[in-house]
Amino acid sequence: MRRALAALALAVLASAASGTERFSFAVFGDTPYFAFDEPAVVRLIDSLADARVAFVVHVGDFKAAAVPCSDELFEVRRRMFDASPVPFVFVPGDNDWTDCHRALAGRHDPIDRLAKLRELFYPDDTSLGRQKLRLARQSASPRFSAYRENARWVMGGIVFVTLNVPGSTNNLGRNVVMDVEHAARMAANFEWLDAAVQRAAGRELRGLVVFAHADPAFGGREGRVDGYARLREALRTHAAALAKPMLLVHGDGHRYRIDQPLRDRADGRRLETFTRVEVFGAPEVDWVRIDVDSANPRLFSVGRGTTAPPPP
């Protein structure tokens, strides 16, 4: 593992010396759902030691909706993620807290489960994993002191930001208490996203990567509660204004896909700088490799982790 990390560090130094920035990171999510998935996920995490990635992000749902949201399971997942050989960042999904009120999940209070996630997975200003990544957390702001899960960091001229946007309609439309939670959390998310875009607009920076759990339903949710409409509009507005490569990486749908779903509101043209990447999900256990290369006009290259060789 040390040799692999040293090789990655040398590669980053070499690219910096040549005037380019080149590195890779890993993303996966929506797994492990059940106990029988755990060995495959452990193997996936362990394999990252030799994959030459700078860090890994799990975009939510570390259990199935029908699995109890117990403290014990949360602690098992924390240990699993903390054993990662590379820095590990976790973004919460709906199965991890908003859906914990369901009978099979244990009839927990979702707000209590989110508090437990914050206690276990975001105890300080570093990532999980045996190698640590220093993070800026939104909770540093007194106004948003609860939102430790929202993190930001900069690497190789790219701003990375995480948002707590789970599936299951983003915790909207179930009852008044959850609707209040939704409104407060989305206010925090929009503030944090605005700050990340402002940071990415700096002359010395090249692009922005946003991580969240939910598929924001770019095609709309006609006739159903829509907890993502304002997020879709915010992404559209920011992508058009930033005019730099921007990725949204999410889970929730359990299907690997890459597309460019946003169009300019004024003329209907595709926003070519914005790309959505959705990761694999249970029952499939795999990860997505994203390569960053400042010499690439599109900046980002995306491929399947188990089949994509490490960059030279």
Question: PLM features: residue spans?
Answer:
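N-terminal active-site segment of His-dependent metallophosphoesterases
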Residues: 18-73, 205
